[in-house]
Each structure stands twice: as structure tokens, then as C-alpha cells.
């Protein structure tokens, strides 16, 4: 009869195998769920495309851009005359003529066009070719000021109404709205004016009845949708325009809306049949680059000053910052070093914002250091650089902000400084937003990627297929003349989980910085875990691993709300249980270390091949010393050369 100890040993073996099977089942279940979700998305898209195709086939409304790219419409002569003699342009950009023709035909349209593609002309030119005026809804005062400044230079009669408009000005605009002899062609308002001013709506009704309101243009139309990156509640009230003024054409414009957002916007604006024209997201003249953010403020400022005084000497640019405080401090630092810089943020007085905007537009200031308030609609053509002092809170925001560079179609640079701490600063700010954290993590994933073409990453986000070869080496990743490999970081992730579990047992919460300190053997001794050896890697590499573990859900954020701040802590994530399975692997793609010679590189390649084929450790004098280094994925070689996990 078997001894109790033997039975116990077998029982433990069975229990261990069952546990491994449970983990595999969980992994398969998670994968199944991912595939089901993807299946649902694809099925929905196919259904939507079929419905759209059916609707197009049964409708007399020709929805293809090619059908509107014609010069035989009765209004074309006037359109061409205004283009050349008023706007001083000789030809249209892609989709401009098509959109203008649709608007002149009094059809509703949504236009998705990249920043700098010339969206404004699509409603400004038809306004000049029509009787009456066009109402333009914009989310920001700076946007309206910029548009009006350009229109004034062109001799076009346009104005705006906002909270700071004088009574005399409001009275004059209201009178012009119903005056049949008025030359006023464009009236800019914020969405709040539509949502909250009964007097203005009353005047709009009278203008519509008199045949004076010919159309409305909703700029940054993605703001209508709570699924958009910049949702604004007052935009939801804009559905009143189509209900009250059904015969006035409506145009929605955006640079960043996905198909899902556009469908939502269409419902919110009460638009039935409409055309949707989408231009390619690609701006071929923009160079995209992600840089590691220097750890000290002094080094960071010095890095930016070298760029401005070197590569961008005498050239115009924008620096985007996370907070108003950052923008003010950086402006002061730049000014002390002789850079002509000005601050721009939402809490400045209107006249101060206008002054900075005007000085920058006239090249009296070289750089505007701004928050997102210096945003939508900024239309200076010769911006040669846009630097992000911190990453944006979403890919949509980044695409729009970086797109303010190079609107003259000459080369311009979009440089983003990526810092680990910024993830959690921004996360604490967007935690209350509907999909704020999800969108932030998409941005972090973009920054973490060291190998894939930046344009491919942007295209994937906006539901567009892009061939990396067409980038023409206009991004940092496509310019790299290096090879990449997958590094196994599974043990590092296991160590992080051990540290977090011990802290939880001690009723301690760990911020991301405290977690890394504990991992490196620094900070409070009680937070260190026996058996967890401090990795022999630079701190920025450890930060990348933590960020990767967060994106892959081995870690998760937890928030604590105080009277003065929202604090982000890290906890064990939903996928951490998978790490207890020895077969489970977590990998990161990193740049291969430079080899001293081709011979050395070939030798190392042969070593890796031997490890992969034999599946056993190779002898090495450095075996013990390099255990904490990242190993190539799938390799058990503990004696591989020490390598630094390289960022771009």
C-alpha cells in the first residue's frame, strides 16, 4: 500500500497540474472573449457597409466624391472666381471642390479631413457664393479669432458673437441677420450661444424665415459625441438647427472622428440622409518623432533650447504642455535664455490671449507655449515644429495638435517627449471621463512602440490601412537602421506582482514611483521582497516594463481622491494570475544592442540559434551576473550578454 507521503506528493502534483490547466482555460477564455468581441465589431461593420451601400443604391443622392468632382455645375463659374480673386488660390485641395459642390446643392455633409487640409474653405467659399449668411459653430474663441483675422485680411465681411461681445455689437449683428442688403457673410458663435441664448435663436428663426440663413457649419463636430475625444455637452443642443431650419444645409467638419463617432454625431444633429467624405489622414510633409523625456527640468529645457536655436533658428513653432503651470514656467525659462516665447492657456484674460496669438501670427513671437486651449482652428501656415512637452491625453488630441505644423506643405517636425510620470499625471486628470483611460493608454502604446511606422500606428487608430513603405522615412521608427528582437520580461512582471502583493498585505498603497523604488531596492525596507533581486537595468528601462505591464493588464491603476488631488496607485491587474503559469510569457520588442563587429553579431546569432534549437542553457562565465537582464523571448540562456533595453 502506498505511503501517505507518496499519495500526498501525487495529490500535490495533480493539484499543480489542475492549477496549470485552470490558467490555460482562463487564457483561452480570455482569448475567446477577445475574438468574440472582434467578431462582433467586424459583423457590425459589414452590416453597416451593406446598409450604406443599399441606401446609396436606392437613393437619388449620389454619395461618391467622384460624382461631385465636376466643373459643369451652374455655380462653378462663380466658385472659381471667388477662389482665385477673393481667396487668392489657384486650385482646390483634395475633396474641397466636391464638398463645396455638395454645399452649393444644399445637401448635408460630414467632412473628415486632416488638420491643415483646408476644411474652412469648404464653408467659407459657398457662403460668399450664396445670398444671406452662413452660421459657423466653433468650440473655442481662439479658433474664431484666427478665422476672422484671415477673413478680414481677405476683405470678407464676417463677425463673431461670444460672452464678451458688447451690447452694441450684439445689436448690430442681430440687425444684420435680417437685413436683406447686408454684406455680412459669416457669423461665428460658440455652441453655448445656440444652447443658452433664446434671443439669438429667436433672431435666427427670423433670419431663416426671411431667407437669410442659407447654411450652418459645425466645426470640430466630433465634440457632439461622448465617444469623441473632446466631448462638450453644449454640442448636444445643436440638433435644434436641423429641426428648426430643415432647408438650411448643414456641414459637419472634423479631423479626427472614427466611423463610430460619426454615426453617433449624425443622430445627435438630427441629420437623416447626408454625404460623408473622408480624406486620408496622412500628412506626408510631417516628420513624427518620440523622444525620451529627460529626468531633470534643466536638461529638458536645455534640450528644447538647442532645438529652437539650432534646427529651428528663426522659425515658428508651438510647444504643448500638460498644465497651465507648466506652460508659464517653460515660457519663463525660454525667455531667460533669449527665446521670444509667449504663454497661452484658458485662464488668461481674453485680450492677453488675443495679443499672444496676434504677435505669434505676425512672427513677433517665435514660440507659443500653450495648453490645449491654443487649439482647434489655429491656421498659421509656416509652423515648422510642434513639440509636445508631455504627451497628449489621446491619439485624437495628438493628431490634431501635431497637425498644426506644416500647413504650407513644407517639411515640419512633430516631436513628442514621452515621460513615465506623465502617464499617471494625465490618468488622474481623465479618470472621470467616459473613455479617458482607454484613450490615454492608446497614446501610451504609441509612445512605447519603438519599431512600427508612426503613420501605421496613427492609421490603425483612425480605421485606415497604411503601407509603411509609403512613409518615405518621415518618422523616427522608419529611419532606424537597426534590428529588433523580443525580450522576455516575464520574471520582471512576476517580481512586480510579488512587491504589490506584499504591500497589499501590509495595507500599503504604492504609487508607480514607489513601486519602481521598491523594485530597485530603494525606499522603505518593508516594501522590498526577499528573493526579488534589483534588475541591473537603467531606471527608464524599468519604467518601460512597468508601462508595458500596465498596458497588458498585469497591473492596473487605482485612484485615491483627496480634497486637492487625485492620486494614482498601482495594483495587481486582472491578468496577473496568468503569470503563475510557467508556460506563460510576457515579451517586449526592443532594439538589438550594437555589436562591435559583424563577426560578433554572427557569433551571437549562432549562439541564440543553438539555444532555440537545443532548448538548453549555454555555458557562460557571466551566468550568475546577468540573471536580472532581459533575455531573448523563448531562450533559457542565462549567460547572454548584458544589454540595455533600448528606447527610440
Swiss-Prot record:
Q: Which residues carry this modification: N6-acetyllysine?
A: 514, 522
The EC number(s) given in the record are: 5.6.2.4
Keywords tagged on the record: Acetylation, ATP-binding, DNA-binding, Helicase, Hydrolase, Isomerase, Metal-binding, Nucleotide-binding, Nucleus, Phosphoprotein, Zinc
PROSITE patterns reported for this sequence: HELICASE_ATP_BIND_1 (PS51192), HELICASE_CTER (PS51194)
- Record-linked SMART domains: DEXDc, HELICc
Question: Entry's Pfam families?
Answer: DEAD (PF00270), Helicase_C (PF00271), RecQ_Zn_bind (PF16124)
Q: What are the recorded Gene Ontology BP terms?
A: DNA recombination; replication fork processing
Q: Where in the cell is it found?
A: Nucleus
Q: What do we know about how this protein assembles, alone or with others?
A: May form homodimers or higher order oligomers. Interacts with EXO1. Interacts with MLH1. Interacts with PARP1.
Write out the function statement from the record: DNA helicase that plays a role in DNA damage repair and genome stability. Exhibits a magnesium- and ATP-dependent DNA-helicase activity that unwinds single- and double-stranded DNA in a 3'-5' direction. Plays a role in restoring regressed replication forks. Required to restart stalled replication forks induced by abortive topoisomerase 1 and 2 lesions. May play a role in the repair of DNA that is damaged by ultraviolet light or other mutagens.
**Name of the protein this chain belongs to:** ATP-dependent DNA helicase Q1
Lineage runs: Eukaryota, Metazoa, Chordata, Craniata, Vertebrata
Q: What is the name of the gene encoding this protein?
A: Recql
